[in-house]
């Protein structure tokens, strides 16, 4: 089901959403989805106001790499492994709990978060993807 432009604009005009997206986008390549296709690569988000500007141009969602880059704009579709390894400065850890029972998934996610916090990780978040 496609999101209509009004729904996207109501969401992406929120300052808290704009700021959260830009904060999370730091040192990451951003993929901007326009309906059924993605925008140009590579791309980045730098300023909160860019989020609304892109939504006004038809952006329906924002996606980011798990990889952290020295400069995401240096990426190229023709870059080889050695070149990419030289540009990469780290990774986000993403754990995908793939279970058909949501209650089991919640228990598992809760235990993982508690463990990571016990290990003194500070930036831990959980996202439900809609069971897809």
Show where each model-derived region lies.
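A short linear hydrophobic-aromatic micro-motif
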Residues: 121-126
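Short amphipathic alpha-helix segments
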Residues: 106-119
């Amino acid at each position: 089901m496609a999101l209509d432009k009004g729904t996207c604009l109501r969401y992406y005009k929120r300052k808290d959403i704009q700021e959260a997206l830009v904060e999370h986008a730091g040192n990451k390549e951003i993929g901007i989805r326009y309906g059924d296709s993605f925008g140009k690569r590579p791309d980045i988000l730098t300023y909160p106001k860019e989020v609304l500007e892109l939504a006004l141009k038809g952006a329906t969602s924002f996606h980011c790499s798990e990889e952290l880059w020295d400069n995401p704009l240096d990426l190229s579709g023709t870059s080889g492994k050695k070149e990419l390894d030289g540009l990469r400065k780290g990774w986000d850890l993403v754990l995908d709990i793939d279970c058909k029972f949501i209650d089991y998934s919640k228990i598992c996610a809760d235990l993982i978060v508690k463990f990571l916090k016990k290990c003194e990780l500070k930036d831990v978040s959980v996202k439900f993807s809609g069971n897809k």
